[in-house]
Amino acid sequence: MKSLLDLFKQFTPDEHFNAIKIGMASPEKIRSWSFGEVKKPETINYRTFKPERDGLFCAKIFGPIKDYECLCGKYKRLKHRGVICEKCGVEVTQTKVRRERMGHIDLAAPCAHIWFLKSLPSRLGLVLDMTLRDIERVLYFEAYVVTDPGMTPLKKFSIMSEDDFDAKFKEYGDEFQAKMGAEGIKDLLQSLDIDGSIERLRNDPTGSELKIKKNTKRLKLLEAFKKSGIKPEWMVLEVLPVLPPDLRPLVPLDGGRFATSDLNDLYRRVINRNSRLRRLLELKAPEIIARNEKRMLQEAVDSLLDNGRRGKAMTGANKRALKSLADMIKGKSGRFRQNLLGKRVDYSGRSVIVVGPTLKLHQCGLPKLMALELFKPFIFARLEAMGIATTIKAAKKEVESGTPVVWDILEEVIKEHPVMLNRAPTLHRLGIQAFEPILIEGKAIQLHPLVCAAFNADFDGDQMAVHVPLSVEAQVECRTLMLASNNVLFPSNGEPSIVPSQDVVLGLYYTTRERINGKGEGLIFADVGEVQRAFDGGAVELNSRINVRLTEYIKDKQTGELVPSTKLWETTAGRALLSEILPKGLPFENVNKALKKKEISKLINVSFRKCGLKETVVFADKLLQYGFRLATKAGISICLDDMLVPTEKPGIIEQAEQEVKEIAQQYTSGLVTSGERYNKVVDIWGKAGDEVSKVMMAQLSKEIVTDRHGQQVQQESFNSIYMMADSGARGSPAQIRQVAGMRGLMAKPDGSIIETPITANFREGLNVLEYFISTHGARKGLADTALKTANSGYLTRRLVDVTQDLVVTEQDCGTHSGYLMRAIVEGGEVIESLRDRILGRTAADDVLHPENRSVLAPAGTMLDEDQIDELEVAGVDEVKVRTALTCETRFGICAKCYGRDLGRGGLVNGGEAVGVIAAQSIGEPGTQLTMRTFHIGGAASRAAIASSVEAKSNGNIGFNATMRYVTNGKKELVVISRSGEIVIHDEHGRERERHKVPYGAVLAVKADQTIKSGAILANWDPLTRPIITEFAGKAHFENVEEGLTVAKQVDEVTGLSTMVVIDPKHRGSAKVIRPIVKLIDASGNEVKIPGTDHSVTIGFPIGALVQVRDGQDVSPGEVLARIPIEGQKTRDITGGLPRVAELFEARSPKDKGVLAEMTGTVSFGKETKGKIRLQITDPDGAVWEDLVPKEKNIIVHEGQVVNKGESVVDGPADPQDILRLLGSEELARYIVDEVQDVYRLQGVKINDKHIEVIVRQMLRRVVVENAGDSTYINGEQVERSEILNTNDALRADGKIPARFTNLLLGITKASLSTDSFISAASFQETTRVLTEAAIMGKRDELRGLKENVIVGRLIPAGTGMAYHEARKVRENMDDTERRAIAEAEAAELAGQAEATEANEGAAAE
């Protein structure tokens, strides 16, 4: 019977649509939606509470108030369904139709729709080719517009004031027509000839760029009107639709008052003004009165649609702006973000979390009361099935009474039914995980300690929410995809997320440390059991060095079987005991060392790769238990004597104070400028602080002990504080330094460093001044945290929005393009090894052995750990890999180009939403870091400035192609190139390290010289930038005039004077003159650049201190001037987050550098006022020139040859320039490197591929250069996949395809310009997006995730992908196939029903 009842349920399958189209409604359409005209402004009768007839809540128009009952009560109940009562005119039906039936208002005068008028750019203005100002004057009855000039010389579309109109009317009489208000605009729109206009615009010969741009916009709009069949005059409303009353409810409050939606107020005003206007028109009232009323009506309609967009917002009784229709859908509390994307969830609860150290990784403790409430429906069903309760009501009673049988059933129901735990803020996918619940007493949820890292949870009062998956499918998904034991790696970098922390680390570290001369040192044991007995009996200490025979199981590479191998190990008792819990296949050497946090992480990683997921999870749990037990036994705690203040501290501080005094004297005697003094003081104190912390760590970390033979030896200290920091359990050297060293330099809130440091530490205590200074830093930390959390959240939101529709849609796109990857080396150190960069990527070409050219990895293999080991042995130093950016899949990405799914460890699965994962991986650490700025307490963590580079390895010196240098008078080699690099090769000629060498550095090595590691390669003055001459001659100054371009600074002690170049802004006159020096040779001529007829000209930049005198002889490599470098600010991610946002928004930097537009020779043309004319001539003689402001630093000189895309003016690069000149590969490299720099500074690891995915989305649109035979317009922006599909079709027909260029959009722009208007509207600028979409008559294909969430379907990713594919298959079937399937299903059902009946019959007998 039950199955029969299900047939009557209203079933609305979501199969019925596969796209959503938006458009503009014609008056006929609005009337067809309507169930009647609303004529009166009344709502309900205040005595009877029944709706007034023809009013805003009229039951006749909108439907009955009670289910199946008319208003007057003549017809009641289901039997009269569909009857229309003749007395009150109400149809007898369900009351829910009041949510869907619309009404309408016939406007007495047309009104323009404010969205098409005021949403910029004004669509009405574009269509009519009039300015917004003019249209507004017409609409609000301040001016006339000529709608039909007749035979007069007047122009159509021309605007005239009232006086003009009167004059013209006297002159021409009725020969022309001019109107005011929306009627005039409507006439113009109606008379618009769209085809003719399109023809005219396409053939417009204009050359002005502005005109072309405007024409393109108009053309696009008119084409859209033509294509979508929307008539422009519909932008002016004649009929206004009325929202169904239940969507703008009127709710009685207690005390006889009513709460109402603002919309009712707005509608009421429209209706009032409309009726009044209608009456005035019937009475033939004077024009001026009617005109005023029409204006008021237009304003009322404006307010209803979008209150406050024009003029003052309409306010209610309480002076608050009323919420209009537009406000209902936009913003955080609008329809999209509040109700469609952010729904609240049933079957959920929340509570405080406490630690559950006894749980297994896949379990959580759920309070009994909570479980009872959450699993109620399951319990009811079970009670009914067992026959304990006959009805749901009885079952409810049973549960409420809490009988023992209920608890038994609860246990049964909960068994193997996973629940989801979520901790807000959910910053990445590990913020929600599934666990199997274990019933516990109490009211707090118990959480497994190892998942805390993923949730970022601690137990200081955090709360978590529980959600119950109801359907079987949901439970299966929870178990397979979301169970905590299936999510052991971070999706952002592939590192394990279940790494122990704090106490556990401390316990494991203590166990695996060795102590010299511990009890039982040197004993030899036969097996671990013996060690255990000896340890229990007290014969041997945990940390004693002993020898043990151990058996380990190693996986054979060929067969993959575990082979036992036994040998005698030198180890400690603790490590031997720990070996018991190692999974088979994990070598003992992995734990035969002091286990710090990093080592433990590595251990779990190795276990995952070698032994698989299941073993690793079990191992992690055992490790946890072991660590807790031993941390308890170790009894490590903190005491005051552990904080050792180094004895050398007073000496170091005294010396620093001495140095600071010297600098102060130099300053008073004028040897150094104020800025230099500040820099040097900060530097001295920075070094002193580091020195103190060095001595302190040396003292803390080592202790002298006596070994077995009575010798004094040094061993690592067992100082508690040192062990906590060293193991990575808690604290860091930076924090210990503040406790036992000196606090050091503090930062002001603006990031600059206070030059008086805090010399005390917390153990000694701070004095009042020091305490006051330190509050500065603390306050900055707190303020930062609050502000940055919001910023970071917004960044994540933009990232998710731009990538949400990127899903793995196919296995292999078959491309052979990719990027060459090599290790990132900076300052001679390998920052990121080649291994880290290519792990889990697919090789684009065969990887060959560098010596014998044999294939190590064929193209298309995913490089895993073992293969990369082979590559490293062979010495491969660059590999071409496929990337997200070179993938050729349309509308998605292929698994091969993406490579390994970092969160699972294998090739990425089809349907994985890699876009969202990338966004989370980049956004999550942003938030994490900003929440952590204040942990260093503002202690300035500035790097001491480098002043030299030294070799890290032995090898041969080589210079890169751009390195240039001259020999100066002292026979030193002085670097005169900006991008010179020293490269060190090993004996095989492989590059080992690469060092950037700044301009003005003195080289300590020559090319092809062999050096040992540690040798100095080059050194320079870190606090100034020099200006150097490359040629010899006599210095001849031009425009170097004291008081005009330079100022004299006299040193009082020595009487020497230096000249400083003044900033043009501070000069009284001569703002455009640039001080320069030329060189004169022996015969009195100007020295020329060899091979050209340009004279050598060297400019002095602003703030330069001139080092030579006029007429002095200079030799090559001599310093002519030096520029002091400004003070350093402290760096923390605060600077970093906006930097990341800036990169992803592809903003042009403020003082951006200039890149060479082509390859050629540099020359300087005639200077203009305040600017230098920089020219580049290519070999064919074409010239490109740029005017550079004089204050900019030009880093090329006359006659230099530059390559296209090389920097010619100093400054940060503009991503748009990089894309245009160097292509998308270089751009991607630039963005990836810059973003990684920011995160690397904070020690955060993110895989490059996530950033590449974002860049792919930033490059997903292109600009049409030449439309060919396509329907595109030149200059139009199109989705890349779409234009590629179009071009394929055109080529197939033998037509000319469209040509296009790459376009780089920032993430906000890219999100808004997506083809899906639903996604764009729910992101930002809702009004503008919807206006545009409506005019274009856009179709949303519902490709992305967001659109599908909004329309309430499964997302086309993951398990939803299969559902969508099946749907497509069903859609492509013809009706006969469909009918056949339906009939087969029906027959099967019938068969089942008969079988059931037969069974029941048999049972009855």
Curated annotation (Swiss-Prot):
Pfam families assigned to the protein according to its UniProt record, in alphabetical order: RNA_pol_Rpb1_1, RNA_pol_Rpb1_2, RNA_pol_Rpb1_3, RNA_pol_Rpb1_4, RNA_pol_Rpb1_5
Keyword Protease carried by entry: no
Co-factor binding comment: Binds 1 Mg(2+) ion per subunit. Binds 2 Zn(2+) ions per subunit.
E.C. designation(s): 2.7.7.6
Swiss-Prot/TrEMBL cofactor(s): Mg(2+); Zn(2+)
Annotated residues for binding of Zn(2+) 1: 70, 72, 85, 88
UniProt keyword list: DNA-directed RNA polymerase, Magnesium, Metal-binding, Nucleotidyltransferase, Transcription, Transferase, Zinc
Subunit structure: The RNAP catalytic core consists of 2 alpha, 1 beta, 1 beta' and 1 omega subunit. When a sigma factor is associated with the core the holoenzyme is formed, which can initiate transcription.
Job description of the protein: DNA-dependent RNA polymerase catalyzes the transcription of DNA into RNA using the four ribonucleoside triphosphates as substrates.
Protein name: DNA-directed RNA polymerase subunit beta'
Gene name as annotated: rpoC
